[in-house]
């Protein structure tokens, strides 16, 4: 039997039935990812397995560095084959890391490789077989999405993005997967460095075709772009936060703080926190007015290696889990919005697993009966996007909320091969329920439980998000 087989992770008969008869064939809504829109718009044909699988993958780079692989083979100038070969040499050392499971799931689907484990001995054969498939239309960017039964993806986009590739995809009626933008306005509140912030404001001003001299101008410029995103199908925002900002402030303070930084003067720590607190509220009010869903990814500390950040830049594998205490500011932020009846549907993702129960109870404070699961505890994110992390999130939500209303999995990935993460999640979910059924913790009723599995896999997301999912 191959390592990744039909019943992988399904250790009870009930789990096998739940997965094969209920979960496996459900379509995918990938409502948060980092796919490059231009690759979908241009229907990119990948030249080789490195380009589709390793390029830009900081998960793999971290593992390779930990295995003693020189940076030349991660982000450097080695050839594509050399980089792939070094990855294959590393794979056997990733046992018990989710990379080992992901790697072999991704070789199984879509490449159909189940007869080998990836290592230095199987590298060349795997390289040649996959590259041959990648030259075919079925393995283009869009072809891979179609193979994975992806109905809709939401990319992650800055307010200054022109969304040209989203328009291209929307206009092509032959492609049955929708690609929608997600509003990610983080840079509009990154006021720690006055010079870089002003450069961003200048670009935003050009894009919005408005002068940005005052705080009101900034909000108007963002509203112009928010409207533009809405016109092009955007129905979600996303915000990457080291912690939650909920300081007290007055309108006059924020206007004065903005004038100070627009004059290229550095803000102090108190001013930064007040401004970021105000921007979080402004973002949330714009989203509520449009009926969008807002997402908050909370708790990453980024670019922790100064030397390699200077050399390689962001998103290259030098981020980690933070340890901020943000329960009170989060409650204060959500309460500010709820007090005005302007709290949009919200998904909260924590990066530190110690916060699972805090988030699991926090969401219950702001459920108001207007929508099932209005406030969501998001799936295990980033470093928690693995078997233990996803299981702990599922367990916390089960005990403290309604798992039955959970909107389920997302890839959070830059790769077109990452849709196997939905399969991984579904297998884990079915395994949990199968064991519960055997133990008598839930009824041994596969139809009842199977419907819930299908809801978490697809139906809940389809019903929760305010976009139209293609049939």
Curated annotation (Swiss-Prot):
Disulfide bonds: none annotated. One of its GO terms (biological process) is D-glucuronate catabolic process. GO terms for molecular function: glucuronate isomerase activity. Keywords: Isomerase. It catalyses: D-glucuronate = D-fructuronate; aldehydo-D-galacturonate = keto-D-tagaturonate. Signal peptide: none annotated. The keyword Nucleotide-binding does not apply. Its EC number is 5.3.1.12. Pathway: Carbohydrate metabolism; pentose and glucuronate interconversion. InterPro entries: Metal_Hydrolase (IPR032466), Uronate_isomerase (IPR003766). It is an enzyme of class 5 (isomerase). Belongs to the metallo-dependent hydrolases superfamily. Uronate isomerase family. This is Uronate isomerase. The gene is uxaC.
């Amino acid at each position: 039997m191959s390592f990744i087989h039909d019943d992988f992770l399904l250790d009870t008969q009930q789990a096998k039935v739940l997965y094969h008869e209920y979960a496996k064939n459900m379509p995918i809504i990938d409502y948060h990812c980092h796919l490059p829109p231009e690759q979908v718009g241009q229907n990119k044909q990948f030249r080789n397995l490195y380009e589709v699988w390793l390029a830009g993958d900081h998960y793999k780079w971290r593992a390779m560095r930990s295995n003693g692989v020189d940076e030349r083979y991660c982000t450097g100038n080695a050839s594509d084959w050399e980089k792939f070969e070094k990855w294959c040499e590393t794979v056997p050392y990733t046992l018990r890391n989710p990379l080992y499971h992901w790697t072999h799931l991704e070789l199984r689907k879509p490449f159909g490789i189940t007869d080998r484990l990836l290592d230095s001995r199987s590298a060349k054969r795997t390289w040649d077989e996959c590259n041959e498939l990648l030259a075919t239309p079925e393995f283009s960017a869009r072809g891979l999405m179609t193979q994975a039964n992806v109905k809709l993806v939401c990319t992650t986009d800055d307010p200054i993005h022109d969304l040209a590739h989203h328009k291209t995809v929307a206009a092509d009626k032959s492609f049955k997967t929708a690609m929608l933008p997600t509003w990610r306005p983080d840079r509009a509140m990154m006021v720690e460095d006055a010079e870089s912030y002003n450069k961003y404001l200048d670009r935003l001003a050009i894009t919005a075709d408005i002068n940005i001299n005052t705080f009101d101008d900034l909000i108007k410029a963002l509203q112009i772009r928010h409207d533009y995103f809405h016109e092009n199908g955007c129905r979600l925002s996303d915000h990457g936060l080291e912690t939650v900002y909920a300081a007290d402030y007055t309108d006059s303070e924020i206007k004065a703080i903005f004038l100070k930084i627009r004059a290229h003067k550095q803000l102090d720590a108190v001013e930064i926190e007040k401004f970021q607190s105000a921007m979080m509220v402004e973002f949330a009010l714009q989203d509520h007015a449009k009926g969008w869903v807002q997402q908050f990814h909370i708790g990453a500390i980024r670019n922790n290696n100064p030397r390699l950040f200077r050399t390689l830049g962001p998103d290259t594998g030098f981020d980690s889990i933070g340890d901020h205490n943000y329960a009170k500011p989060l409650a204060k932020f959500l309460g500010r919005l709820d007090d005005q009846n302007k709290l949009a549907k919200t998904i909260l993702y924590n990066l530190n697993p110690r916060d699972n129960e805090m988030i699991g109870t926090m969401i219950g404070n702001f459920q108001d009966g207007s929508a099932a699961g209005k406030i969501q505890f998001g799936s295990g994110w980033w470093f928690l996007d693995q078997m233990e992390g996803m299981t702990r999130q599922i367990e916390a939500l089960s005990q403290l909320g309604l798992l039955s209303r959970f909107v389920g999995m997302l890839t959070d990935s830059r790769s077109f091969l990452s849709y196997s993460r939905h399969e991984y999640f579904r297998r884990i979910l079915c395994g949990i329920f199968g064991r519960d059924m055997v133990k008598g913790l839930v009824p041994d009723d596969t139809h009842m439980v199977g419907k819930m599995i299908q809801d978490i896999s697809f139906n809940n997301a389809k019903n929760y998000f305010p976009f139209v999912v293609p049939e």
